[in-house]
Regions:
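Class I SAM-dependent methyltransferase core
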Residues: 121
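A short His-aromatic
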Residues: 198-200
């Protein structure tokens, strides 16, 4: 992407969460090894005893929208959750990704060729980042938010209402690969695929991105993210939370999106290096 300097300028005033040197060292030599290698049964028992809402949300739906909201809000009630949400690299990186992606999406909306711009959000859950972007953008836009499961939609509608965007979001349940023409009243000017690629196989990433690419105008942007192992707790997530994620480098994910017809990529890491938020554009 030729305007990388311009994109960096969009982010200059954002505040992100970071680890200090001492805290980073403690996580590497003490905290992460304990979390990753303590008996999983013991850790689950402790989390149940302390009534961890974050753990319960992941046990019910690993990586689902409820656990994401707990991490986003950053204000849990239980002591165990306070430690996890404020001390864990993944929740901190999630909040960084939210700030970074919402700003990028808002600026992409402002540069859409039409007004109001149409945002298509895939794997939307409650659509928090999309709603944040609609509220931030200085031009009019509306969003179609699609997910296979409608469970998060009520929360999403209420969140959008409180953000002043309640009349600009439309939630739909279904598979975009087979029903895209029924779901869209207008081709998307911007596509958002945040927080889903890490739960998809390579084949699923390509098939979903290809379906969307076919209805986008040439040069229209898509926003998505890769997930790296920099959080340091994959073993903990798998053993204790039952959360299995697909880790890819930014280049590996860009290669998959390239197979679906996207190119001209720009990758922006959040400060912890766990997520790279990537802008790609439809070729042609």
């Amino acid at each position: 992407m030729r305007n990388g300097d311009e994109v960096q300028g969009w982010l200059s005033d954002l505040e992100f969460e970071r680890f200090g040197t001492v805290r980073r060292l403690l996580k590497k030599v003490l905290i992460n090894p304990l979390a990753n290698y303590m008996p999983a049964g013991l850790m689950r028992a402790v989390l149940r005893l302390t009534e961890s809402e974050l753990a319960a949300a992941n046990w019910a739906d690993p990586g689902g929208w409820r656990s994401m909201v707990i991490s986003y809000d950053g204000n849990p009630r239980q002591i165990a959750d306070k430690l996890l949400v404020h001390g864990g690299a993944m929740p901190m990186a999630l909040r960084n990704r939210r700030r970074l992606a919402a700003r990028l999406l808002a600026r992409l909306i402002e540069r859409a060729p039409v007004e109001p711009a149409h945002v298509l959000s895939l794997g939307a859950g409650p659509g928090i980042i999309t709603t944040d972007a609609l509220a931030q953008a200085r031009r009019k836009a509306y969003a179609t938010l699609v997910d296979l499961n409608a469970d998060a939609f009520e929360y999403g509608r209420e969140y959008a209402r409180r953000a002043g965007a309640g009349n600009r979001v439309r939630f739909l349940a279904g598979d975009i690969r087979t029903h895209i023409h029924e779901m869209l009243d207008h081709p998307p000017d911007v596509v958002e695929m945040l927080g889903i690629c890490e739960y998809l196989t390579d084949e699923q990433v390509v098939s979903i991105a290809s379906a969307v690419n076919r209805v986008m105008a040439g040069g229209a942007p898509a926003l998505f993210n890769s997930l790296s192992m920099a959080h340091g707790n994959d073993r903990f997530f798998r053993r204790v939370f039952g959360l299995h994620m697909n880790h890819r480098s930014a280049r590996e994910l860009q290669a998959l999106m390239g197979q679906a017809g996207f190119g001209d990529f720009l990758s922006i890491p959040e400060p912890l290096g766990v997520y790279h938020v990537i802008i790609g554009r439809k070729g042609g």
